Amino acid sequence: VIGGAECNINEHRSLVLLYYSSRLFGGGTLINKEWVLSAAHCDGENMKIIYXXXXXXXXXXKDRQIRVAKKYFCRDRKKSVIDKDIMLIKKPVNGSTH
């Protein structure tokens, strides 16, 4: 978000950050304990999901980073244009409340 304001961590518990290559690259929404919905153009190698982050300080959120188990895209998606720009991310199942 450009020009956004920090919010209380409990206001948007379903929001996550997508992080890879030492930088934040996008966001997503928790659908349930196993799945995150994001835009396909936010895909990256060795992506991690950061949950319960109140600020964009990813270095302080090491304990809230999880690896991606698998990513799914539309079969007939065209990368050359923003077409069917949806990515489902399966995350490892754990006992977290996030």
UniProtKB/Swiss-Prot annotation:
- What Enzyme Commission number(s) does the record list for this chain? 3.4.21.-
Q: In which tissues is it expressed?
A: Expressed by the venom gland.
Residue ranges occupied by any Peptidase S1 domain in the UniProt entry:
1-98
Q: Which PROSITE patterns match?
A: TRYPSIN_HIS (PS00134)
Q: Is this entry keyworded Hydrolase?
A: yes
What is one term from the GO cellular component aspect held by the record?
Answer: extracellular space
List the subcellular locations: Secreted
Q: Which residues are glycosylated?
A: N94
Q: Which GO terms describe its molecular function?
A: serine-type endopeptidase activity; toxin activity
Summarize the activity regulation: Inhibited by PMSF.
> What GO biological process, any one, is recorded here?
proteolysis
List the catalytic residues: H41 (charge relay system), D85 (charge relay system)
Q: Which InterPro entries match?
A: Peptidase_S1_PA, Peptidase_S1_PA_chymotrypsin, Peptidase_S1A, Serine_Proteases_S1, Trypsin_dom, TRYPSIN_HIS
Could you tell me the keywords of this UniProt record?
A: Blood coagulation cascade activating toxin, Glycoprotein, Hemostasis impairing toxin, Hydrolase, Platelet aggregation activating toxin, Protease, Secreted, Serine protease, Toxin
Assigned protein family: Belongs to the peptidase S1 family. Snake venom subfamily.
Role: Thrombin-like snake venom serine protease that preferentially cleaves the alpha-chain of fibrinogen (FGA). Induce platelet aggregation in the presence of exogenous fibrinogen. Possesses esterase and amidolytic activities.
* Subunit comment: Monomer.
What is the designated name of this protein? Thrombin-like enzyme cerastotin
Q: What species was this sequence derived from?
A: Cerastes cerastes (Horned desert viper)
